[in-house]
Amino acid sequence: MSSNNQSSSVAQAATSARTVSAGSAEATDANSTASNNNNNSSSTAAAGNNSDNSSPTTGTGTGASTGKLHGGHTAVNTKERVVDSVPFPPSHKLTLAEVFDQRTGKPNHELLKQHFILEGRIEEAPALKIIQDGAALLRQEKTMIDIEAPVTVCGDIHGQFYDLMKLFEVGGSPASTKYLFLGDYVDRGYFSIECVLYLWSLKITYPQTLFLLRGNHECRHLTEYFTFKQECKIKYSERVYDACMDAFDCLPLAALMNQQFLCVHGGLSPEIHELEDIRRLDRFKEPPAFGPMCDLLWSDPLEDFGNEKNSDFYTHNSVRGCSYFYSYAACCDFLQNNNLLSIIRAHEAQDAGYRMYRKSQTTGFPSLITIFSAPNYLDVYNNKAAVLKYENNVMNIRQFNCSPHPYWLPNFMDVFTWSLPFVGEKVTEMLVNVLNICSDDELMTEESEEPLSDDEAALRKEVIRNKIRAIGKMARVFSVLREESESVLQLKGLTPTGALPLGALSGGKQSLKNAMQGFSPNHKITSFAEAKGLDAVNERMPPRRDQPPTPSEDPNQHSQQGGKNGAGHG
């Protein structure tokens, strides 16, 4: 498109583009933004444990059911499930022949959907084929893809598979709706591999109408640090994880929607002046800790975006520990230089599921829009999720709430590992009690006819006492392990991420107690702001070997000051 045509398109969109509240019969102009406060009823997800021991899910394990006998005694039935009203997950793993249609060679995504909802799994072969076939399609796409409206834009998913199912209910069937996902499909939630397999199967089935961008979590560094690698190894294998990493390297970094909107996971970079700079990037690699590729995935708008105290275009992102904060001035400068209407991004949880930032003075349209599609993020944020539907120059924000999902113990811990310290403590207590049934006088008594000498009797008594002391020490060790295990589980339950604060575990029992100070077991996180504050440490880039110098130490640091000609790009 020529520059004149782009200007005409932007001008036309600026006057006609509107934001409409879903379900509302009345549209508003670009100066007003609304949303659908739609509290759709949640579909009930099947809860239960998996067929192996590595997936302990609340209320579904085999256990002892009871019944009353005469005299008030209780009969225990160890062959029946305690909660038999919840369907047991399918033990059968779908095969390659079952997953893929022999005629079309494409996966049966509807079968996968129903199987995953029941917590079923598939064999490694079809899992690898889905990931690799999807990667082959992604590899053919440009680094910045072009998408025409109508399109539904979705933000972070973060392994919340059951909420992803709700998203498609709200947004429309992928068979008839064009979708653009802005990244962060994995980590934090406990159903990340299901999200990847299902989205990749949709990509294979609808390659021209379903588009996937890369988020900052689609990399080896973060998936090793958070939960995705562990999830793949528990549910499938490390080969599946490695295939996912290779596929993530193929994901495009940005999309140009309708020649009007730049869609990206994070935001702008001081090294990206124009759209062509994005097209020239080499994306087929692990994202670096600094540079334009890192910025597209990691950067954020300033918290006081639109009300900045200074004229800096970019400042160091102290919240993420990498990349930059970009200002309203930097955003407007980029939009004007590239004939764009707005930037649509994800990357940050929003209480309402979305946020419209200050409008551009030249177009009257929000210069920046954040969309977030993981409701009740981490099960504690209490936020709504949203998708953005853009059609006929009308922007429609649709919100939705979270759906029920099966429960996993923190870090995919199985029930036997979780209960072992408690069981060990009780077993050693019983053993100590058994050995303590005889008194000191009884220890001196010998049942044999030949009496022992004083030295032999004293030695035997000391041997038995040493055994009792050793078992007592073992009991105390198990007691400490049990207490620490309970503290760890309790502390994980009190933090939004299910992860321990840094250094809490290495310091032992006292560190755990200190970390729990300020946390009340009866306290429940009730506000979005509280959850976001507690979770801030987990939004930073984890330490890595190629960490760049801080802005003050970097001799090649880009100029952060905006100028008359947009010189803030450095």
From Swiss-Prot:
Its cofactor is Fe(3+); Zn(2+). Interacts with sra in a complex that contains CanA-14F. The lineage of its organism: Eukaryota, Metazoa, Ecdysozoa, Arthropoda, Hexapoda. Its EC number is 3.1.3.16. Fe cation binds at residues 156, 158, 184. GO terms for biological process: calcineurin-mediated signaling; female meiotic nuclear division; meiotic cell cycle; regulation of embryonic development; sleep; wing disc development. This is Serine/threonine-protein phosphatase 2B catalytic subunit 2. PROSITE patterns: SER_THR_PHOSPHATASE (PS00125). Belongs to the PPP phosphatase family. PP-2B subfamily. Expressed in CNS and PNS. SMART domains: PP2Ac (SM00156). PANTHER family: SERINE/THREONINE-PROTEIN PHOSPHATASE 2B CATALYTIC SUBUNIT 1-RELATED (PTHR45673). The active site is at residue 217. Residues 553-562 have a biased composition (Polar residues). The gene is Pp2B-14D. Zn(2+) binds at residues 184, 216, 265, 347. Residues 1-88, 530-570 are annotated as: Disordered. Residues 1-67 have a biased composition (Low complexity). Calcium-dependent, calmodulin-stimulated protein phosphatase. This subunit may have a role in the calmodulin activation of calcineurin. Binds 1 Fe(3+) ion per subunit. Binds 1 zinc ion per subunit. It is an enzyme of class 3 (hydrolase). InterPro entries: Calcineurin-like_PHP_ApaH, Metallo-depent_PP-like, MPP_PP2B, PP2B, Ser/Thr-sp_prot-phosphatase. It comes from Drosophila melanogaster (Fruit fly). Disulfide bonds: none annotated. It holds the Pfam family Metallophos. The keyword Transmembrane helix does not apply. GO terms for molecular function: calcium-dependent protein serine/threonine phosphatase activity; calmodulin binding; calmodulin-dependent protein phosphatase activity; metal ion binding; protein serine/threonine phosphatase activity.
